[in-house]
Amino acid sequence: MSLPKQSVFPGVLTGAWNEALQKIRSQNSVARLWAKDASWWPAEKHHVPIIESNLRWLDLPEQIETLIAHAVQRAAAARKDGFDHLVFVSMGSSTLANAASVSLSDPSIQQHLHLLDSVDPDAVRRLEAKLPLERTLFIFASKSGKRIETHALLLYFLGKLRTAGIAAPGKHFVAFTEEGSYLASLAKDS
């Protein structure tokens, strides 16, 4: 099956459009993007590792089966451990996939899925009032693993689990973040 060719009508920008297309072609931009060539972006040398890190999404087609298998395995383990409430905790752009997961989920389980993307005390307390903490799994998503808001919410709910006398409160947390990030090291220590 072939996809229809997309049409672009740049109007008064036709000259600039054609110039940009020529530049992209002459610099072999598509191949360089797939090769994760950080030199394609004009940047300071110290930004190169950041650019390379941000291009790792290009590896997803090769990794997706393994990632899905791991997620299914983790979900089965969570159900076996008695978790029946799930809170996605994230800030900024990390929230987008979580919001989609909640909104696209089966309506019969939506009452047990929650999205927390705010540190507003009233919002946090309203959510907390709905949760049976002993049966709640918190999934923290942060690309960099450095967001102060995410860390504050992790510490808040960890404290709540400890205050409730829940054994092994670290088992109530899952982290999706970059390898080697602060959040990843915190998850490994738990």
Language-model segments: residues:
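Extended, charge-enriched "interface" segments that sit outside catalytic cores
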Residues: M1-R79
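Glycine-rich phosphate-binding loops that contact phosphosugars or nucleotide phosphates
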Residues: A76, K80-S190
